[in-house]
Amino acid sequence: MADHFDLIVLGGGPGGYVAAIRAAQLNLKVALVERVHLGGICLNWGCIPTKSLLRSAEVYHEMQNAEAYGLTSFKPDFDLDKIIARSREVATRLASGVKTLLRKNKVEVISGVGQLTGNQQMLVETTEGEEKILEAKDIIIATGARARQLPNVHSDGKHIWTYHHALKPPAMPKKLLVIGSGAIGIEFASFYADFGAEVSIVEHAPQILPMEDAEVSAYVAKAFKKRGIRILTQSALQNLTPDDEGVTAEIAGADGKVTKERFSHAIVAIGVVANVENIGLDKLGIKLDRGFIAVDGFGRTNVDHVWAIGDVAGAPCLAHKASHQGVIAAEAIAGCDHVHPLNTQNIPGCTYARPQVASVGLTEEKARQQGYNVKIGNFPFIANGKAIAQGATDGFVKTVFDADSGALLGAHMVGAEVTEMIQGYTVARTLETTEAEIMETIFPHPTLSEAMHESVLAAYGRALHF
């Protein structure tokens, strides 16, 4: 006999659990099916524990440079086991918090593996080995994604790692190859370099952080090289052969020449693959687009009553995108008024390396490609009072405006705490704010955020402090 709900959510990551909570707030009877961890990859083996590791690296770096602030007799050392243990404690604490939130909102959590047997029915094999049939008016698929693997290369966790292995290393690698330079690759490169590993990054694209503005990418590359991180762009990994002592990498450089080099470890960070297998998509004829479930701006699939959100529904594969998509889908299912479709141009992206990177909207290059007559503002942190006081003068803020309408097309930041500031520009884009309105906004002094204001002023020849 089937258990009946208004909504079934398959997957308890940042998209799934948020969708479940929002639907429950709207008085829907909700079941959430999760096979492993509430909180998903982000909370357990992604965003959150990574930030804990990077915070340890940041503190270690600051201790090494304490004399610059008048502090003496510092000889810092680190305990990798304790660094890892702290990151796991943080993840466990937050996962417990998600469980509490779901219980508070009266969401029924079912531990097990779910498979759609109809557009309003799901078969669940629970972790206890039971089979349950669930029925609902609507189903949201939020099964997430997993690390993309290299062809014919197995990430065994010994010498070849995915992000999962890199979050819990048995020892600090001596010589590390990072394959891929998106946010994940860059963050791990930064972390391991801070603790003394010899790091090389190989990237097929002409620049690291390929999705970021070219000026930002170039700045990060320069900063990384200054830290001793080697960067090989326009290069391709031809082969990766593990043995008992490490790995041998064959890398084709920009000139086409293939070289062999030994590394103690390699991290594969070349993107993700959607978890679309074995959940019943074929039976229902649910369409895919380049391996991801095809959806509209509200998360609807081509099959009535079946929705998809988060990484399984395509790029950008970001936790905050998944959560917002979850809210949109839940409100659309509940019949709320004034539900707005997802605008992917207003989703900020953040990379928490040293230096940090944050952006929203169009890069200068993309804006020009789309035919905009652009105005560019650029303001360096070295001209910002708070940055000088903090000893954090690296980086800049770049803004891209439509010269004809004054619309903010994009914002791109590199430097200290920019991941905490990008939301200001995201709000501006969401509200369709013009350059005049931002210029008329009062920014507090002294703050790093004043550089955001000055960048806008600079776009119109009005910068006051540079």
Swiss-Prot record:
Active-site residues, Swiss-Prot/TrEMBL: 445 (proton acceptor)
Predominant localisation class: cytoplasm
Function noted in UniProt: Lipoamide dehydrogenase is a component of the alpha-ketoacid dehydrogenase complexes.
Remarks, miscellaneous: The active site is a redox-active disulfide bond.
Keywords recorded for this protein, A-Z: Cytoplasm, Disulfide bond, FAD, Flavoprotein, NAD, Oxidoreductase, Redox-active center
UniProt GO BP: 2-oxoglutarate metabolic process
Cysteines paired by S-S bonds: 42-47
Compartments, record wording: Cytoplasm
The protein's name: Dihydrolipoyl dehydrogenase
